[in-house]
């Protein structure tokens, strides 16, 4: 829609101006209290179009995230092909959408590996942004990243 395009253009402008936009989360909107339900095909199509638009309008260093628990798993590859490059915190409870359980990381690995995608743990700050962190915080984030890298898959 025109409103989404305008919002994405504003975000792109802010990124070019200030350079501090780490990610944009693209997910279906659900009213508070609505029972859990699968995305309809029109909702999926609308969200995929928004992802494509976001990837075209936002600078490449801005990650696009979608929570995999809000997609039908068999349609998640389409979101990745459209431009998603971050699945967020998949190993935790979704505190924003608690009615939607997170898929197991192994389930996601099995789905994505044959398509050439790799599931990788990361800190809440993307690596490209570490140089902007204060030294003490950067050291802590690097320590957390080493722990994540050494954890069993």
Could you say what each language-model-derived stretch is?
Residues 2-153:
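Auxiliary Fe-S-binding modules of radical SAM enzymes
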